[in-house]
Amino acid sequence: MRKTAAVLGFGFVLILTASACRKPAEAAKAEDLISGIGLTRLEVYGQRPAPDGLQSGSPHVHAVTDEGYYVMSGSGRVELHDLKQGFRTIEMTPGRYLQFPPGVLHRLVNEDHLTILVVMGNAGLAEKGDARIYFGQAVDENQAEFARLVGLAKAEGLEGALKRRDEAVRAYQSLLALWTSDRDAYNRELRRFIDVHMKAASERRADFLQAVETGPVAWGNRFKQRLAALPLSPDDLSPAIHLPPDEPTLGMCGLLRPVIKMDPADRDR
């Protein structure tokens, strides 16, 4: 088995471009992905089943960022939970695209080598605390244990990432059981978890705002500048290219090959 590089934090999409290091007033640069999005190739974990017998990623939620899945190959499904509609599943086959807003707890299930192109708004927020894995109430109330579980991928590599997934799925099985047996209790637990994450995310508002201003907001300003400059040529940006890494990183849902570094496309490659 090839070695994989563990990622810091949650990092479902793990896009951190140069935008995160710029002052908010600066415009987006050529090496940033269009409109400040995050983009990654995801191979959903399939090394061994989770405690419920399914090959899957870790159930988790985002605080302020929308997410989209475009199926490149294979098949599987997405399990969704939100406060309006509760639990439902969406089948995922090649060519299908699913998009959902923040506040939706979700888990990817791999049925046959599911490979997805993941698109996220607000590149870089995943590392800053926008995502939270569901480990249940007991872990949410124990910060040391939560930090230990989150850090398993960094500490133990692929096996650690799978252990983290397993702990999440054990708690998640209880949530699914509530959907069947006690819908009111299910709604209370889902709301509790989302509220815990939203409160934690609110403490990082300044970091989130900087990432938004140096990513999508900066790109929006650039588009306005191009419109105002017409009929002059838009700006001095040049084509840029990303070359995929040799080894994947370990995300919440699987093996990731994120678009992180963009280089000038000024020669044949």
Give a label for each model feature.
Residues 4, 8-28:
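Bacterial Sec-dependent signal peptides at the C-terminal "C-region" and cleavage site
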Residues 41-63:
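Conserved short histidine dyad/triad with adjacent acidic residue
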Residues 59-61, 66-71, 89-90, 98, ...:
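His/acidic/aromatic-lined binding-pocket segments of jelly-roll/cupin-type domains
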Residues 63-78, 82, 119-121:
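Short, conserved beta-strand element in jelly-roll/cupin
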Residues 82-102:
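Short acidic-glycine-tyrosine-enriched beta hairpin
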Residues 113-183:
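Double-stranded beta-helix
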Residues 155-231:
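An accessory alpha-helical subdomain
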Residues 206-269:
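C-terminal non-catalytic accessory extensions
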